[in-house]
Every structure is written in C-alpha cells, then in structure tokens.
C-alpha cells in the first residue's frame, strides 16, 4: 500500500489536466500557469488522465465522456494542409504546439511532430479501449479514435526508409534527423507498425534497433540499454506493459525493456549518490535527471569552476548523452515508481518533505528545482527561494502525465490493462517481433513451455532484483556515504 502522500499527488496531478484544459475545445496547455500554447503530447496524457479520474471518483463517467468527445471532435475538425499558417496538422500528423483557441500551428518554429503525434495517438487509442459502453456517445469516441489513428500517414515521414523522420516544416520540408534507437520513439514505431492504413514495414524496427549496441553497456553498476534522460525510459511504458515480452534484441540480451528501465533508474540514483559534479543535495533520495525547465542559459562559477546552466533542456545520466547542471525534476523519480518502487517511494517522500513548501502546490510538484543555483541574474523562468536555490514556476503536461499514469499502473496496472485490449498496439508489438508474456495467444500458451519458462525466469529475475535492491538499500543505511557507489571507469 502506498503512503497517503501518493493519493494527494495523484489527485492534484489529475486536476492539472482537468482544470487547465480549454473547456471549449479540449486542448491541454503545454504548461501552466504560463499557458502559452497547447501541446499535442499533453492532450494525449490528458485523454489518459480522464479515465483515471473516473476510476478514482474525481469526475463522473459522463463528465469524462463529454470532455473526451469534445477533444476528439475538435481534433477531427482542425484544418490540415501544407500551408504555413491556419492549419493544425498535415497528413494526419499534428503540429507539436497549437494555439489554445483555434488549434492552429502556434508559430513558424513549430514542427509537424512524429513523436508528439504518437504520444497524442496513445491517448486517443487509450480512450478507444477504455470507453466500451453501448451508448451512442461512447460508440462515437471509439469511432473518432479509429478515424484519427487511421488518418496518420506514417510512411510519408519515411524519407530515408525504413526510419521515420522527426518531423516536417512547411517552410523547409522534412527534418533531416530520423528516430534511431534507443529513446522514447519506441512508441512511435509501434504505432506506425500497427497502423491498418499506412503501416511501416517490420524492417523499420530492425533498423531502429541497429544502433542499440552503441548504447548498451555498464553505467554505475548497471548493465543496460542506455538513454540519458529518464523520460526515454518512461514514456513508452506509460501505455505498454513490457514485462515478459521481448523483441529479438532483448531476447538476445536475456532481459526485457521493463527490466532495462529499472536498471536505468537504479543507475541514475547511484549517479546522484556518487555526485561527481558535487551539486547540492544530490543523494539517495534526491535524484532524477530528465527534460525540464531550468533557470537560465548561462555560465557561472560554482565551487571555483565555471559551469554551464540551461533553461528548458534535456538532462541525463547515461553512457552517451549526458548533461547535468544540478536541476532535478520530480517526474524523473516519481514516474519511475513501477520500475523501482523501493527507491522511488522514499525519494518522493523526501522531496516532498524537504522542498514541499515551495515545490509542491495546487497541481502537485512544480516541474523542477535546482538547490545549487543561487545567482542573482535575470531568470528565463522560475524564481529564487532565499537560501534554497531556484525553483520552477510552471507545471509541464508531459511531466505531469507520466506521474499520474505510472502511479495508476503501480496501484493496479490500470493503463496497461486497458491498453492490452487495443488490437493496433498488439499488432504493432507483434510486427516488431515481440513475443511471450501477455502477447502469447491463448491457444498457444499451453503448447510452448519453452517461452513460458523464459517468461517465468525473466519475471523471477525482475522480482529477485527488486528484493535484492531493497535488501541492499537496507544494508547501505549502515554504510558511510563515501563508499556507496563506484563511478564507471
């Protein structure tokens, strides 16, 4: 049973989506209270949040159905086309950021985004799977969800087949970077593979995983497929239960993506305990690097040496892409609760206890904080708390969404269970070569003791790791901090 604090976090985080979304059209802001524009990824998380609200009795099913229908109808009606202005999408994709009122592309720097469209579609397909009633309104939700997903022309963004481009600009055309593993775009490929109308071919997954070996290795005592910021180890797992299912790459490595994310979380925590950059407050219960707000793009002296600080940026600890300027985002730890509850629960409680007075408010945890940043200079965002450092002033939708959904998954596997009913997601996983676990067809489940044994072994390994980690954490209480973590060679 989770400590009572988590119920409070869930309720406040749910209210972020319920209260800040535009009641006229269902568009959810990228951030609040600054609320400059809507984010299509935020909308995907909002569509996922509403059923969590129903299940907890925070809104009625009727209210959530109304809000969901409003959103899906508006998404259907947003004008699409290649023009630079006055459109909200093209080829079934949507622009990353939309104007909160009209739903048009917010500005000329905003791209038509493949991965953000995928995050939106995960929410759309979640709604399709959840609202299974026989009445006309729930039927309309299912029909609209189908329509929106079928419209996305995934293959159009395959300019360098079989990989999918990060997006497109009406001014300059296709973005020259493609999504290659390993990162959050795992969910993009699964949705593109599962499409009934514009599917990419299975070799897309093969090529996406081809770069994995570059990111596989040992970091802070964990051997895993690395990506610096924790969001890359979380986003795909919000909707898909990767326990006991494996693609070819993970079969060869003998683990699954769930266990991989667990190792990433434990490595992040060990990095914070070792604290090679000597940032303030880092330790066993204050950790978690991901993308989020920061104070300012600036260089300042810290402990006698010049350090780079950033405003909104990806931050991470891993084998390759690392950036750490002392900024911690609570979502990094809290949304990892399914992977490593034995370290996430105490971290959440400690961050609430130590920083809650200024970090925890109406909608839960503000985006981020940096105890090491106390420079009296103009800030991009946030504020300085005397003696405590910098704290963000906004909540961010793509950081709030995983907090809410992952606590729900931890409690009763809610989001995962609903999503398992969605045939498109299942097809996408199968096309990517995933087998075992919940993907095993029922008639085959009896016939293949081999894969059952493998799955049971993987499950046992995961459980054993959890128990060992809990025991290890207990043992560490008696150790001085200095010998807790060995940084990588």
Predicted features and spans:
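Ser/Thr/Asn(+Pro)-rich, low-complexity disordered segments
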Residues: 1-489
């Amino acid at each position: 049973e989770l400590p009572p604090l988590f119920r409070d976090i869930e309720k406040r985080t749910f209210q972020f989506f319920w209260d800040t979304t535009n009641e006229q059209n269902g568009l959810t802001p990228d951030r609040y209270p600054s609320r400059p524009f809507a984010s299509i990824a935020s909308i995907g998380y909002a569509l996922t949040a509403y059923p969590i609200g129903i299940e907890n009795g925070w809104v009625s099913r009727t209210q959530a159905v109304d809000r969901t229908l409003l959103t899906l109808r508006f998404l259907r009606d947003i004008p699409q086309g290649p023009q630079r202005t006055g459109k909200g999408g093209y080829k079934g994709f949507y622009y990353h950021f939309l104007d909160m009122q009209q739903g048009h592309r917010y500005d000329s720097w905003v791209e038509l985004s493949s991965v953000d469209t995928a995050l939106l579609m995960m929410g759309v397909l979640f709604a399709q799977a959840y609202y299974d009633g026989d009445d006309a309104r729930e039927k309309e939700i299912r029909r609209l969800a189908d329509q929106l997903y079928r419209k996305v022309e995934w293959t159009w963004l395959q300019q360098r087949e079989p990989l999918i481009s990060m997006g497109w600009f009406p001014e300059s055309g296709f973005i020259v970077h493609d999504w290659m593993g390993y990162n959050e775009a795992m969910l993009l490929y699964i949705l593109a593979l599962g499409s009934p109308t514009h599917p990419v071919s299975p070799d897309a997954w093969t090529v996406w995983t081809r770069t994995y070996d570059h990111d596989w290795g040992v970091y802070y005592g964990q051997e895993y497929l690395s990506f610096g910021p924790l969001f890359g180890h979380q986003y795909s797992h919000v909707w898909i239960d990767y326990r006991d299912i494996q693609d070819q790459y993970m079969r060869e490595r003998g683990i699954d993506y769930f266990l991989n994310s667990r190792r990433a979380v434990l490595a992040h925590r060990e990095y914070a305990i070792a604290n090679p950059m000597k940032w303030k407050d880092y330790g066993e219960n204050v950790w978690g690097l991901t993308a989020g707000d920061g104070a300012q793009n600036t260089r300042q002296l810290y402990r006698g040496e010049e350090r780079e600080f950033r405003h909104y940026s990806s931050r991470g600890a891993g084998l390759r892409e690392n950036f750490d300027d002392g900024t911690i985002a609570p979502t990094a730890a809290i949304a990892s609760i399914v992977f490593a509850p034995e370290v996430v629960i105490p971290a959440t409680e400690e961050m609430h206890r130590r920083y809650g007075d200024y970090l925890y408010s109406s909608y839960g945890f503000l985006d981020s904080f940096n105890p090491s940043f106390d420079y009296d200079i103009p800030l991009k965002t946030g504020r300085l708390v005397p003696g405590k450092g910098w704290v963000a002033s906004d909540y961010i939708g793509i950081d709030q969404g995983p907090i809410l959904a992952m606590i729900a998954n931890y409690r009763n596997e809610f989001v995962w269970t609903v999503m398992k009913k969605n045939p498109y997601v299942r097809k996408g996983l199968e096309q990517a070569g995933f087998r075992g676990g919940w993907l095993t067809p029922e008639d085959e489940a009896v016939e293949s003791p081999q894969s059952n044994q493998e799955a049971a072994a993987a499950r046992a390994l995961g459980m054993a790791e959890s128990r060992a980690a809990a025991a290890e954490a207990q043992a560490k209480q008696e150790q001085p901090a200095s010998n807790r973590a060995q940084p990588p060679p």
